[in-house]
Regions:
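Regulatory cytosolic signal-relay segments
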Residues: 4-58, 81-84
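A short beta-strand->alpha-helix segment at the C-terminal rim
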Residues: 24, 138-167, 191-224
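Catalytic NTP-binding/metal-coordinating core of nucleotidyl cyclase/transferase enzymes
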Residues: 37-40, 49-141, 179, 282
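Phosphate-binding active sites in nucleotide-utilizing proteins
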Residues: 79-80, 86, 92-102, 256, ...
Length: 712
């Protein structure tokens, strides 16, 4: 099969070009020099997104990649051949970055700079970047091997990754535009790239901390880098951890004990009992990010072995929408016991034995299953036409569920259903239709905004998971921190700031350990910075005073990704509300959005603001006090992230807008809001106005005190 990119003749079974690494079966895009323009899809996104035009603060992972000794290569090649090599090289880079929804935002002559987490925030930006780096390493190894075989040239690429906060914005005008990131995070990623050996990828400590649970890393040491005050610890990215999914990570971290959720667990146990009795059940566990949905489901699944049930699980990663049928394939691998890295012959034997034990009638389905799991015999092509494959797979899944549940009770678990793609969701619907009168429980979890059509069946139940009550949150923090008296006030502060969200609490505690604020008592082993929380946390003590809790990057990325999924209007309204404060009056919000040139120049009608607030309430960002009429952020950290994601200039405009709105809406009682007006002018660095309104507030207090003094 000939590659449309470089013209190389490949084997018929090849999925990627053995010369340039480009995916086969894809029509080639019109030739263009990718270094001269912003990609069309990104330009459209930026031009229609006010935040992208004005700029935002985002948590991202930056990836740099370039050709090692590119000048030597260029000197040894004809200019036309060198251009052709670069064309193939950049196509490989683009494919690898876009595969994991990254953005190639700069071409550096012989390499690229890519962003993961901008312009669209991703909660797993560091994992995506590492997956992309490993994918590129393999594709470029093939590319380099072919170049060495045909031309005798040594071709090697090095990559560097770093994670942190950057300012992302448009540079230039609408006709010639670049979208880029600026900040210390970017420069450090480039420095780390220069430390990488040929055909390898290095990550800085910030990235390593975010991905250590999911990837194999080899520590290279701490290096003094230009522009960095302290040596930076650097790691080589070696590969993804075998048999290590998000579910495995949650399970490993859950060994500290299960806190609360007794009522919710009781509902799940009731559904399991009904399924075991032959009344198939589908249960959806719904809740906001980090609230403990997966942990609750795993607590139920611990009972499967004891109840004699066969169990299979799948996780939908955040990039699952770009991978066809991913959760369905994961369910099949889990059900048949297929392990990563095992020989394909072993996998085929496992599947054949399992299916034929259920029914000899499954013999005709073996080629389909082998093809789906990419373990078919290369000498015996079995791929059926695409228009036949989907119906055949649907029929196979229905038969499999019925046959397996007849042999033994079947429990299927799909984690993070909100990330599933339409094809996978449709096939999950086929399973749902088939399990009604079987001994099958399908357990899924998802975020509140998700809906699937198959949730209309009569045997579907939904369990809502809310924030932990204060008593349970206190118990969780005692498990994480201990009960040393020095941590009493800190534990209360963590509980208040994290709002009963278990994941947020765990990440804040780990961040405090990493920064040396919490330390083990004398004689106990100190938790390792950047590592997962210890299985049984030793009693921790307060090692240094703390005035304010910072938001861990993991939590910030998760909340920022959720904000970015909002419609633009709703996101802008939420950001404006965040400037007002954790609690805000809709009238003040309406005034600044309707009358002030705030939020990138946007103005909104009263109707538009009301609609936005209703939608933000529906998706659990805010709550409305029906008695007082005020609104409040449901979670304190959401307000902090929505506030912190805005540039200082944008926040300043909004603070001035709030101050003016308070003056307009409280013209008859200015003394009562004088201190609040002063606060907003001060936050905008309007020093003169801030002092004037503070004097007015002080004068009011003085008058009140004098009145009390002279009261008979």
């Amino acid at each position: 099969m000939q590659c449309t990119s470089c013209g190389h003749d490949n084997r018929d079974t090849a999925k990627f070009c053995e010369n340039c690494g480009r995916a086969l079966h894809e029509p080639r895009a019109p030739a263009a020099d990718p270094r001269t323009y912003t990609p069309k899809h990104l330009a459209e996104r930026i031009l229609t997104n006010r935040a992208a035009l004005e700029g935002e603060r985002k948590q991202v992972t930056v990836l740099f990649a370039d050709i090692k000794n590119s000048m030597d290569l260029a000197e040894r090649m004809d200019a036309e051949d060198w251009h052709k090599l670069l064309d193939g090289f950049f196509h490989v880079l683009n494919e690898g970055v876009h595969r994991f929804e990254g953005t190639v935002n700069q071409y550096t002559g012989d390499g690229i700079m890519a962003l993961f987490g901008a312009p669209i925030a991703h909660e797993d930006h560091a994992q995506r970047a590492c997956h992309a780096a490993l994918h590129l390493r393999e594709r470029l190894r093939v590319f380099g091997t072919q170049l060495e075989r045909t031309r005798g040239l040594r071709f090697a690429v090095r990559m560097g990754l770093n994670s942190g906060e950057v300012v992302v914005a448009r540079i230039g005008d609408d006709l010639r535009m670049d979208y880029t990131a600026q900040g210390h995070t970017v420069g450090l990623a480039q420095r780390v790239e220069q430390l990488a050996a040929p055909n390898s990828a290095c990550v800085a400590q910030a990235t390593a901390t975010l991905v250590a649970d999911y990837f194999e890393l080899r520590e290279l040491g701490a290096f003094p880098l230009k522009g960095v005050s302290e040596p930076v610890r650097v790691y080589e990215l070696q590969g993804a951890r075998r048999e290590r999914s998000r579910i495995d990570v949650v399970l490993a971290r859950s060994r500290r004990g299960f806190v609360g959720r007794r009522a919710e667990l009781g509902l799940l146990e009731q559904a399991l009992n009904e399924a075991l009795a032959g009344h198939g059940q589908v249960v959806g566990v719904a809740g906001e990010p980090g609230i403990g949905k997966t942990r609750l489901c795993l607590e139920l699944l611990r009972q499967c072995d004891a109840r004699g049930a066969v169990f299979a699980q799948a996780h939908c990663p955040a990039h699952a929408a770009s991978v066809a049928l991913l959760p369905i394939l994961e369910l099949l691998r889990s059900l048949f016991g297929i392990r990563d890295g095992e020989r394909v012959e072993t996998s085929r034997r496992k599947i054949q034995r399992a299916l034929l034990q259920l029914s000899r009638g499954f013999a005709d389905s073996l080629p389909l299953v082998f093809d789906l799991l990419e373990i078919a015999d290369a000498q015996q092509p079995t791929r059926m036409p695409e228009e036949q494959r989907q119906p055949a797979l649907a029929a196979f899944l229905r038969r499999l569920v019925q046959a397996q549940s007849a042999a033994a009770p079947l429990v299927l678990f799909v984690d993070d259903l909100h990330c599933i793609n339409p094809e996978g969701d449709a096939l999950l619907g086929e399973i749902v239709e088939a399990l009604g009168w079987t001994r099958t429980l399908l357990l899924v979890n998802f975020r509140p905004e998700h809906r699937s059509d198959w949730m209309q069946v009569s045997y579907y139940k939904e369990v809502a998971v809310a924030a932990l009550p204060d008593d349970d949150a206190d118990e969780l923090l005692r498990c994480l921190v201990g009960e040393d008296a020095s941590t009493d006030a800190l534990r209360q502060l963590i509980r208040e700031r994290t709002g009963g969200n278990p994941f947020f609490a765990e990440e804040v505690v780990q961040s405090l350990v990493d920064h040396g604020v919490l330390a083990a008592e004398a004689g106990s082993a100190n938790p390792q910075a950047g590592a997962a929380l210890p299985r049984a946390a030793p009693p921790l003590r307060l090692a240094q005073p703390i005035a304010e809790l910072s938001i861990p990057p993991t939590v910030q990325a998760l909340l920022a990704a959720r904000l970015d999924r909002l419609a633009e209007r709703d996101k802008l309204v939420l950001q404006a509300a965040a400037v007002i404060g954790p609690r805000f009056a809709p009238a003040v919000l309406q005034h600044i959005l309707e009358h002030e040139p705030a939020t990138a120049g946007a103005r909104f009608s009263a109707e538009a603001v009301a609609e936005a607030l209703a939608e933000l309430g529906r998706v659990d960002f805010i709550r409305r006090d029906e008695v007082q009429g005020d609104c409040a952020f449901k979670h304190p950290l959401t307000q902090a992230v929505a506030y912190g994601s805005q540039l200082a200039a944008s926040r300043a405009r909004l603070h001035v807008g709030v101050a003016r709105a308070l003056q307009a809406l409280h013209a008859e009682q200015l003394g009562q809001v004088a201190e609040l007006i002063a606060h907003h002018f001060s936050a905008a660095n309007w020093t003169f106005e801030a002092r004037r309104w503070r004097r007015r507030a002080a004068l009011r207090v003085t008058k009140i005190e004098l009145g009390r003094h002279h009261r008979p």
